[in-house]
Amino acid sequence: MLRTHLAGSLRAEQAQQTVTLTGWVARRRDHGGVIFIDLRDASGVSQVVFREGAAAEQAHRLRAEYCVKVTGVVEVRPEGNQNFEIPTGAIEVNVTDLEVLNESAPLPFQLDDQAGEEARLKYRYLDLRREGPGHAIRLRSKVNAAARAVLAHHEFVEVETPTLTRSTPEGARDFLVPARLQPGSFYALPQSPQLFKQLLMVGGIERYYQIARCYRDEDFRADRQPEFTQLDIEMSFVNQDDVILLAEEVLSSLWKLVGHEIKTPIARMTYAEAMRRYGSDKPDLRFGVELVECAEFFKDTTFRVFQQEYVGAVVMPGGASQPRKQLDAWQEWAKQRGAKGLAYVLVGEDGTLGGPVAKNLTDTEREGLAAHVGAKPGDCIFFAAGTTKSSRALLGAARGEIARKQNLIDPDAWAFVWVVDAPLFEPTADATASGDVALGYSAWTAVHHAFTSPKPESIDTFDTDPGSALAYAYDIVCNGNEIGGGSIRIHRKDIQERVFKVMGISHEEAEEKFGFLLDAFAFGAPPHGGIAFGWDRITALLAGVDSIREVIAFPKSGGGVDPLTNAPAPITAQQRKESGVDAKPEPKGDAASAKPDAPADK
């Protein structure tokens, strides 16, 4: 090794020891001919001092981020010169020998200053030298190790599934890879290991996991990455409770890394309850504001706006003091979400109701409204009226905005909840309207994916009454973020074919695209289920950062662009020719025997 000690490991107990350190010049200060350098390596920072001799002469040319090796004696700093903000603040190293391992060009940004994200990603190798980004990547490694330890204890088998497979045009868009040896044909990068892990269960592996790289060619959305990571788990001969029990053990081990003890069992909430109370299937439970249903309260109203299928309200504590400009801004906020506006009533300090809606209410409605919704003097009541789904979604979003504006969220709190009993199917129009890519060609598509089992009570009726069928699925939510989701899978061919039929996938198409899975189900496929955790989001939460880009070593920026390597980039004419990217595939008689990968798992 070029060094004897790590810079961040030195303490007063090592005084008078001769040590050799390596690292980068973080800061340089000259004081009357004495040069002080903050030397940084992965472990931390030590102050090194050049007082006299050849080493001190050399030190005059040191600049920020020079890579150096120093040898010297550990000394206790003089009284009054200690820096108790860092672990090494009681000592310094009196340097006797200096070797410059490599110089540094002028920096595009100072590492101890704020920098724009584009510059940080373009020079990510410099950004990673900073304490925050470096800590996030090291934390991610600990997260991986903690999960592996739990799963190894339970005798899970880590299996690598293929990353070159076949495209599924009905799923989310795939990244395609030309097959040079079969011009005109393409592999697809997997959106998840879903079907392969199910085949592992058929193969008798019984307990599988993988820290899996997944790929989705999606339109740009904030804080999404085209390549991402999930902890993928599958188990045979289990029910929902078994998977949840293991998942809670994994999560507990992860949150212990940041000193938090998760109280288990984690509470469960049905999808219907989450939507009714919070307007979201991933509710943030760190604050207590809830939606209040008002359709019954306004059943005899003469106010046409409230003569709707659904009328609901959410209270903004202290919101009555908002200026008119802010109340108008709420209307624009609602319109950006596809609503016509956000009706409101202001509750005065004397209990009287104000605002444009109040004058349209009857005396009886005005007298009972505050009590019905739980509003106090000084509060603002926001309303949504229309279809149940869209109105609840608007109020749920307003609930989150209220919490942020009124500082209702404890930033140090952790609130976990399982959301269970979601619908098995949703109208295809709803899925496409929300930006999802619907699988199948009928009026119904899968909420999770096509391989999720119906709940036992829905097995006999899900194809005759798709709108009422419940999924044998479970999502884990932390602080309003869905950090994982899974389900008990279909393991019987007849049930899988019935699900495909509901989704408008014909028998012939199912055989062509998923025949290998259907064939496998015919050979004693065991009951099985699993879960996939969003590894980037979990690590971001643990690291206390807002964006998943902060916990990915080399992330993409907006639109999937990599500022560091300038990827994606055009390929040469020779590469196009060799790859066969422009070739038309030859017709194949056995095309129906080729099989696809599946949509992303939850």
Swiss-Prot record:
Coiled coil: none
Compositionally biased region (Basic and acidic residues): 575-589
Catalytic activity as recorded in UniProt: tRNA(Asx) + L-aspartate + ATP = L-aspartyl-tRNA(Asx) + AMP + diphosphate
TM helices/strands, residue ranges: none
Pfam family, one: tRNA_anti-codon
PROSITE patterns on file: AA_TRNA_LIGASE_II
Family: Belongs to the class-II aminoacyl-tRNA synthetase family. Type 1 subfamily.
Protein name (database record): Aspartate--tRNA(Asp/Asn) ligase
